[in-house]
Amino acid sequence: MASEISFAIPGEPCAFARAGANGKRRYTPPKQASFMAAVKLFASRAMAGAAPMQGPVEMTVEAIYLAPASWSKTKRELVFWKTSRADADNIAKLVSDAINEIVFVDDAQVARLSVTKHYGDRSVIIVSVRSMECCG
C-alpha cells in the first residue's frame, strides 16, 4: 500500500457535471467521461499495482489553466487565480470519484481536501494523495 502518490493529467481541467437526460435515459457528458477515464489511467499508473490506501487521506488538487490567447501579455502576467467556471469543488469531485477504488478504498476517506485553480504555462491537473494514518 502506497502512503503518498502524485500524478498529473495533461489537458484542460474538467469539472463534474450533472448527468444529462435524453428522454427517459440519463447519460454522462462525453467530455466528463473521457476525462474520468484519463484520471483513472494516470492514477493506476501512479499506483503501480499497489493496494488502495486505507484510513483517512489528504487530497490536493491543483487545476492549471492556459490563459486565453486574447489576453495581453500584461494581463497574463497580472492574473494568477482563475475565478470563473469550473467550480473547484466539482473538479475535486470528478477526481475523487475517478480515483475511488484505485488510490483509496472509498472517497469518504478524504478527511482533508485542498483545491486550487490558477493560470499557468500549460493546462494540467496535478493530484496528490497522502495517507494521514500515521502522522495526522
Go through the PLM ranges and name each one.
Residues 1-136:
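Acidic, proline/glycine-enriched N-terminal capping motif
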